[in-house]
Amino acid sequence: GKAVAAEDICFTTVEDATRFVKETQVDMLAVSVGTVHGLYTGKAQIQHARLKAISEATGVPLVLHGGTGVSDEDMRLAVTEGINKVNVGTEMNVQWVDRCKSTFEKGKVNDSVRKFLIPANQAVTAVLMEKMALFK
């Protein structure tokens, strides 16, 4: 990923979100409230007050892109503030590749590919189950 200076980040405003929802009648709205796609070099800084205000003003379920690296505590709070869907693709990819690497190192050339892929898929399933539990 590319590093972006904090002052260059464009956050969703309540006014923009409200206007967009009214004009488009979307079912869900992805908002920019302090997360980014990819791996973090620091801690995600979710702007919870902004998130809650957007949720209250729009009344639609909100989507959080860049959920990889967001702490469980921040994620639980974001869910109470209107987040209904979280994208954690990078975290799933990292788990899948790491598990494949470790499994391939232990395998033999003539092993079935399933021997390598099933553990990787199970690692992704574990990540998703952990994230889904944050919505309860």
Q: Which role does the model predict for each range below?
A:
Residues 56-66:
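Short beta-strand/loop segments at the ligand-binding rim of alpha/beta enzyme cores
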Residues 101-136:
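Extended, intrinsically disordered, low-complexity segments
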